[in-house]
Design a protein with these regions (language model features):
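Acidic/polar loop-and-plug regions of large Gram-negative outer-membrane beta-barrel proteins
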Residues: 200-204, 216-285, 298-329, 375-408, ...
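Repeated loop/turn-to-beta-strand initiation elements of outer-membrane beta-barrel proteins
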Residues: 190-193, 227-230, 289-292, 346, ...
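Transmembrane beta-strands of outer-membrane beta-barrel pores
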Residues: 169-175, 199-203, 214, 236-240, ...
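Outer-membrane beta-barrel translocator/receptor signature
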Residues: 126-129, 140-218, 224-228, 276
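Membrane-embedded beta-strand positions of outer-membrane beta-barrel proteins
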Residues: 165-169, 195-197, 232, 294-296, ...
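Acidic, small-polar-rich N-terminal luminal/periplasmic segments of exported/outer-membrane proteins
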Residues: 28-162, 485
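Hydrophobic, lipid-facing positions within transmembrane beta-strands of outer-membrane proteins
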Residues: 97-99, 149, 163-167, 177-181, ...
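Structural signature of Gram-negative outer-membrane beta-barrels, strongest in the C-terminal barrel
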Residues: 223-225, 329, 348-350, 356-360, ...
Length: 506
């Protein structure tokens, strides 16, 4: 892979005022100031909802900041995964993020600002403050799924009291290019507006491969009072790309002699996404040791992927299969939590209490590819570069359509209500204990439109969590942890018709 040649233009403008007179500080006695309280604003992992330092968390966590993203030239989640231990990236059929957490593959365990983001697509990084990768199950904080871990993207928010602008421009030797803008404006009455936008074009060494992505994300921060801050965000995404499913395998390994052949074409292999995400968050400080948080998210996704791919190969001929698969999903998610630090009997407790409600409407259908010569989704072709899918291996003209063979069509309605509580107890400077649990009421109805049937299921699931941390010194921690997660048998994308009892992971 050729290296990315990146040109970065950065402009920063800062407006500030200073009222202190010019004095020689060397002639003054400097008074030592000790600040107490406000511990809720210490460095923390956003997804964990509490201000506990990373070393005091009984879970493996990795953080990649926006500075790391820019320095390394990361453009997608998969780029970050390749640099992170304990997780791997997989192909994702050429149209979605697909992560393997400790051997468990997932295309749905993604979060944005701690809110579920489980539609299958390639997520952009232009508006990301940091990416948090947590390994191991933890349904207490994240609910269903996450059997191997989760990835949380923390988005950039408008900054009150600052004015700055940054530009990124990049181009590589294949012709791929990207441009991004990040600008922050100080408004009146304790408010700020920040605009992030990007546009990129995709290209690499493979035939047919191209695509475009556009993202626009204005955010506003309103300092309503010294204790209350409101964050507002609107995000729009418009993606289109060629789907490359790779090359056939022989004896369990890719046939490298085919590495310069694309088994697809630009008309049959395409993915599109149009999404709007609106978020509102209110943070209210009750005291130096207590804070409440409420968030509301409304999102709408319209996703399509269609493709043909090599489903069989004997060394000389290739069998092609394919399908057309659109999804429409609307989410409404509300969550609230209270974080309180208190001392009981000389022992410090960090208490988290919260609740979450999720309403999801999902519509999905799939048409199998249909070749006119076989009236089936499989057809055999000679291997050429480029591949010719208009004539089969017998020399007979054939045509492909995606409107003849309906495989499935479902409409799903999902409601999830959750409550959770967690207590981290500082027994001493060396020993810490974490205990808690979450109760989820998961209700799903799947209508099988193709066969005119319907199935429903309700699961009430309790997920415990416990951990012990030992710190032999300040910068070292050893932990023993037990946690559970569950995955309803509705499939990651909520479209399965046969709904069985949910599975659990420990």
């Amino acid at each position: 892979m050729k290296k990315l040649i990146s040109v970065i233009l950065f402009f920063s403008f800062t407006v500030f005022s200073q009222t202190a007179e010019n004095e020689d500080v060397n002639d003054k006695n400097i008074e030592e100031v000790v600040v107490k309280g406000n511990v809720l604003y210490s460095d923390q992992v956003n997804a964990l909802k509490t201000p506990v330092p990373i070393l005091d968390v009984p879970q493996t966590v990795s953080i990649v900041t926006d500075v790391d993203i820019r320095k390394q030239g990361f453009r997608e989640i998969g780029d970050i995964i390749r640099y992170t231990p304990g997780v791997n990236t997989s192909q994702g059929e050429g149209h979605r993020d697909s992560v393997v957490f400790r051997g468990v593959r997932s295309t749905a365990d993604f979060f944005q600002d701690g809110v579920r983001d489980d539609v299958q697509y390639y997520r952009s990084l232009y508006n990301v403050e940091q990416v948090e990768i947590l390994r191991g199950p933890n349904a207490l904080l994240f609910g269903r799924g996450g059997t191997g871990g989760i990835i949380n993207r923390v988005t950039k928010k408008a900054v009150v009291g600052e004015t700055f602008t940054a530009h990124d421009v990049g181009i590589d030797s294949f012709g791929a290019a990207d441009i991004a803008l990040d600008t922050n404006f100080q408004l009146e009455n304790g408010a700020a507006l920040r605009i992030n936008l990007h546009s990129d074009s995709l290209a690499n060494h493979r035939d047919h491969y191209d695509g475009n992505r556009v993202g626009f994300n204005p955010t506003m921060t309103l300092k309503v009072s010294p204790e209350t801050t409101v964050f507002l965000s609107y995000e729009y995404a418009d993606h289109e790309r060629f789907i490359d499913r790779g090359i056939p395998t022989i004896n369990g390994s890719p046939d490298e002699s085919l590495s310069d052949i694309v088994f697809g074409n630009s008309s049959a292999n395409v993915q599109t996404l149009e999404a709007t995400i609106m978020r509102a968050q209110v943070e209210h400080t009750l005291s130096d040791t207590s804070k409440a948080n409420f968030s509301f998210t409304s999102s709408s996704f319209d996703k399509l992927y269609q493709n043909i791919y090599a489903s069989g190969y004997d060394g000389t001929l290739v069998t092609m299969d394919g399908y057309y698969d659109p999804t429409e999903r609307d989410n409404t998610i509300m969550s609230a939590n209270l974080v309180n630090e208190l001392s009981l009997g000389g022992v410090v407790h960090t208490l988290l209490i919260g609740a979450e409600f999720i309403q999801t409407d999902n519509e999905n259908l799939r048409y199998d590819a249909n070749w006119s010569t076989t009236n089936d989704d499989n057809e055999i072709f000679n291997i050429t570069r480029p591949m010719d899918f208009t004539v089969n291996s017998g020399g007979v003209a054939t045509a492909l359509d995606y409107v003849t063979k309906l495989n499935r069509q479902t409409a799903s309605d999902i409601s999830v209500t959750s409550i959770f509580i967690q207590d981290q107890i500082d027994l001493s400077d060396n020993w810490k204990l974490m205990v808690g649990g979450r109760l989820d009421d998961f209700d799903i109805t799947v209508d099988d439109i193709k066969n005119d049937t319907s199935e429903s299921r309700n699961d009430n699931t309790f997920s415990p969590r416990a951990g012990v941390i030992y710190k032999p010194q300040e910068n070292v921690s050893l932990y023993l942890s037990y946690s559970e997660s569950f995955l309803p048998r509705s499939g990651e994308q909520l479209s399965l018709i046969h709904i069985w009892r949910c599975r659990r992971a420990i």
